[in-house]
Amino acid sequence: MVLSFILVQNRQGKTRLAKWYAPYSDEEKVKLKGEVHRLVAPRDQKYQSNFVEFKRSTKIVYRRYAGLFFCACVDATDNELAYLEAIHFFVEVLDQFFGNVCELDLVFNFYKVYAILDEVFLAGEIEETSKQVVLTRLEHLDKLE
């Protein structure tokens, strides 16, 4: 189970968070961001699944929270539900850390968001599944500032 990348984009397609676990050129990254947004933005939350076939034997697992799309590109043979739950776990940690997280928190506290992401995912793998452990580590990091 390995991630290729994680993207958080708003409804307009602005990328608020991007973490790349596979080597892509800058041109490829821009192209992938656009392709992912075009795939997930028009989908109906009520009647369509949160999994979309992508290219090169990969798929996009995504979840929409308010105006943000949290997207993960995973191998086609990986368990989609595990990554869907990992995305939800990441958002729960963000919610608890920031107190009802919003898009502005991602923009102005991006370094903290990347720290949280690095606590949950390491080298494209799900690393930590305990919310309390992640929040305790983040408290320790906050004390260092």
Curated annotation (Swiss-Prot):
Subcellular localization, as worded in the UniProt entry: Cell membrane; Membrane, Coated pit
SUPFAM superfamilies the UniProt entry points to: SNARE-like (SSF64356)
Keyword Signal: no
Gene3D superfamilies noted in UniProt: 3.30.450.60
CDD domains: AP2_sigma
Single GO term (MF): clathrin adaptor activity
Topological relation to the membrane, as annotated: Peripheral membrane protein
Subunit organization: Adaptor protein complex 2 (AP-2) is a heterotetramer composed of two large adaptins (alpha-type subunit apl3 and beta-type subunit apl1), a medium chain (mu-type subunit apm4) and a small adaptin (sigma-type subunit aps2).
Identification of the protein by name: AP-2 complex subunit sigma
Organism (species): Emericella nidulans (strain FGSC A4 / ATCC 38163 / CBS 112.46 / NRRL 194 / M139) (Aspergillus nidulans)
Gene of this entry: aps2
